[in-house]
């Protein structure tokens, strides 16, 4: 499922291709690209739920922003988000790329992924997808994009 999301993000969203694609055609394109129908369905459902935030159909959790408070992760969240992922989320909050509500959206979308393995690189892409879908987060999206691609470009040398 995550492979389908990455493919969709890189092919349709990140490249600013035509965003209004017929769902049947999209499903056929993904099937032709070799993706499993169940993964396609789950990825499209994941994106629909993410779009619900943008359309205001789903409200993010309202949290008090006490600077001394700390997020305690549930065992399920710790199982999916290892220490490096949780540390990265905290880092993004500290540099104000994420606020508390968007952090919770990211965590919710991570937990909704149907994937056995999940690492820091995957988290960065999920964050980028979430920020892309939230109006008014263009600067945060750009900062996150720079963080993602700076690190990856540095690894190529």
UniProtKB/Swiss-Prot annotation:
Pfam families in alphabetical order: DUF494 (PF04361)
UniProt-listed InterPro entries: Smg (IPR007456)
Domain of life per record: Bacteria
Family: Belongs to the Smg family.
The protein's name: Protein Smg
């Amino acid at each position: 499922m995550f492979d389908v999301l990455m493919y969709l993000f890189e092919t349709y969203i990140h490249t600013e291709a035509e965003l209004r694609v017929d769902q049947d055609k999209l499903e056929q394109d993904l099937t032709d690209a070799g993706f499993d129908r169940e993964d396609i369905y789950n990825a499209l459902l994941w994106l629909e739920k993410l779009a619900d935030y943008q359309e205001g159909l789903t409200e993010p959790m309202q949290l008090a922003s006490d600077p001394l408070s700390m997020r305690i992760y549930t065992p399920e969240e710790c199982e999916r988000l290892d220490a490096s992922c949780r540390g990265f989320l905290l880092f993004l909050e500290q540099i104000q790329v994420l606020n508390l509500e968007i952090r919770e959206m990211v965590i919710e979308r991570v937990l909704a992924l149907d994937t056995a393995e999940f690492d820091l690189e995957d988290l960065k892409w999920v964050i980028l997808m979430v920020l892309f879908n939230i109006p008014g987060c263009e600067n945060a999206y750009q900062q996150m994009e720079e963080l993602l691609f700076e690190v990856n470009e540095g690894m190529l040398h």
